[in-house]
Amino acid sequence: RLMEDKPYYRAALAAQTLHYVPPERRNFFYHVTALDPWPLYSHDIHWMELARIKHEPNSDPIRRTAPLFNIFQSRSEGFATALEELAMHEGLYDDVPRGRELVWIMLANRAARGLASLHVQANEWTLAEAGRFHARWTPRGYSDPDNPLVGFEQLLYLRQPGYGTSYVTGKAELDALIADAAAADEARPAADVLADVFAMLNREGSVPFALYPRRAR
C-alpha cells in the first residue's frame, strides 16, 4: 500500500467519476478513459491532496495556507504524473496488461505538449504550430490539433511558463527523490521505502521537491 487509506480520499476520488464519451466527441483524455479510466484516476491524486488540506491541515502555519504565488506546478503535476506509473509498477494493470500502454501514452502526450510550449514561449512557434507538434507526437492519433483541448492547453502554458513542462520535470524530481531514499537503505523492501516517501510527502505538504528532506545525493 502506497499510503494510508482515508474515508475522505475515497469520497474525493468518487466525485471525479468519469462517463462514457462517444468517439466523435473525444479529446485526448477521453480516448484514454474510453479504454481504461485508471490512468486518469491515478492522476486524480490532486483531489485527494485537496481533501487532505481540508480535513488534515498541515501543522506548519505557513504551509497550511495558500501561498501568494504558484509554487505547486512541478510538485502537484509531477506527483500526479509519477503516480500513474508508480501505480502501474505496484500492480494496478496486472490483470489488464495493455492498460500499461495507456500510462506510457499519457506520459508521451505530456512530453509532446510540454516541449511544444517551450517553443511558443521562445517566440519560435505560433500556437497553431505548437498544436500540430503536440498532436503529431501523441501516440495513436489520440490528439487532434484542431481539438479545443489542444488549443486550450497551449494557451494555458503560454500564460504560465513552466507549467507545460512541469508534469515531466516534476515526475523526474520525484523519481530522483525515491531513488535517493532507496539508495540510502538498500536492505529495505522497495515497497516500504516507497511508502515512507509518500508519508513524507503528506507530512511536509505541497512544497517544491527541492525543499523535501533528502537522505542521499
Where are the language model's segments positioned?
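Long, His/Glu/Asp-enriched segments that create or flank divalent metal/ion-associated functional microenvironments
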Residues: 1-217
